[in-house]
């Protein structure tokens, strides 16, 4: 660990157009902070994690290293996902303080001085950011995002804030806590809340990306949310169990109704349609329960194989520093 240094982790996937704009903006912020008395002694490093980009993002990262020794890059052997990219960046960061930022400038670099001030003067271990509006985002995505955060807050022990971004500044204690969680199926928004510590939240208006297109489709976000639920809650298993108990109670009640009607009124209950509906209903509940169990078992299977979270194709950093 290097004292008085801020490491900026920037996960990138096909961000060739946005990366130079991000670099210009973040260096402006660095220069401004270096001129202020409170932050004059800080040094910086920029860790660009190329997550298997196919548009020349790695070439741009290499160009930035030519004139700036503070720029580091890690290039994966293939696309491993943003979660892996963030984890790799945290492992290789040497700074006493570490920030995670997206390259599309949807995470305003101008907030960095205020975040650092909160760590130093107010005693926080991490400063997170959250969007107070979702301007420019499809309405249906905003609706489901809000519902997801509300649901996760109720069914899990991870403190998840609505509108929270991955953009945050953390001290070394907080970073080491995250690095101690070596699970393969990572859901960082949940992990940030699970580790606890003293966290301050700063709010900002939503900003559209400066270049390129979002890499997250609605379907990908849906699957990502399922991963989060499975990773941090047993609620789906409880729901499946409760559904099974309710089905059993309904079946017993129906059986008693048929027996009583036959014995008391001598009127047998007929009708194949009702029988088919009941069978389909119970079968649907069974398939749903099997699917829920399958999700949990598949995650256990991936964890049991103990494969690395990512593989590096090339980098100008010698080795990880997760034990700092």
Which residues make up each language-model segment?
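Hydrophobic helical membrane-anchoring modules
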Residues: 1-4, 134, 187-324
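Conserved amphipathic alpha-helical interaction elements at protein-protein interfaces in regulatory
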Residues: 28, 32, 63, 67, ...
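Acceptor/aglycone-binding surface of glycosyltransferases and processive sugar-polymer synthases
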Residues: 76-78, 82-92, 97, 109-191, ...
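Structured catalytic core of nucleotide-sugar glycosyltransferases
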Residues: 1-136
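Histidine kinase transmitter module recognition
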Residues: 11, 36, 49, 118, ...
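Residue-level signature of catalytic and energy-coupling elements of molecular machines
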Residues: 8, 26, 89, 104, ...
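Residues in soluble alpha-helical coiled-coils and helical-bundle/repeat scaffolds
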Residues: 14-17, 106, 110, 179, ...
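Short conserved micro-motifs on helix faces and helix-strand junctions that flank
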Residues: 11, 76-78, 168, 241, ...
């Amino acid at each position: 660990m290097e004292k008085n240094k801020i490491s900026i982790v920037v996960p990138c996937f096909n961000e060739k157009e946005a990366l130079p704009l991000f670099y210009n903006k973040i260096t402006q912020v660095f220069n401004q902070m270096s001129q202020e008395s409170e932050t004059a002694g800080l040094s910086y490093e920029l860790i660009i994690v190329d997550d298997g980009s196919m548009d020349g993002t790695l070439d741009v990262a290499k160009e930035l290293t030519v004139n700036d020794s503070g720029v580091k890059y890690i290039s994966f052997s293939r696309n491993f996902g943003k979660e892996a990219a963030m984890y790799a960046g945290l492992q290789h960061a040497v700074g006493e303080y570490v920030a995670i930022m997206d390259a599309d400038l949807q995470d305003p670099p101008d907030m960095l001085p205020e975040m650092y001030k909160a760590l130093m003067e107010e005693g926080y271990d991490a400063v997170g950011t959250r969007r107070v509006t979702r301007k420019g985002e499809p309405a249906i995505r905003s609706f489901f995002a809000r519902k997801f955060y509300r649901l996760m807050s109720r069914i899990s022990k991870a403190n998840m804030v609505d509108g929270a971004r991955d953009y945050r500044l953390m001290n070394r204690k907080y970073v080491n806590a995250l690095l101690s969680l070596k699970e393969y199926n990572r859901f960082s928004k949940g992990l940030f809340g699970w580790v606890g510590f003293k966290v301050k939240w700063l709010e900002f208006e939503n900003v559209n990306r400066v270049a390129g297109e979002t890499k997250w489709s609605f379907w990908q976000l849906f699957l990502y949310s399922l991963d989060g639920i499975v990773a941090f809650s047993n609620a789906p298993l409880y729901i499946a169990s409760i559904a099974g108990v309710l089905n059993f109670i309904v079946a017993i009640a129906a059986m008693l109704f048929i027996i009583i009607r036959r014995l008391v009124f001598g009127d047998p209950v007929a009708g194949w349609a009702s029988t088919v509906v009941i069978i389909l209903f119970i079968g649907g509940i069974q398939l749903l329960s099997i699917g829920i169990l399958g999700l949990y078992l598949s995650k256990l299977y991936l964890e049991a194989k103990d494969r690395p979270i990512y593989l590096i194709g090339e980098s100008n950093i010698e080795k990880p520093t997760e034990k700092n």
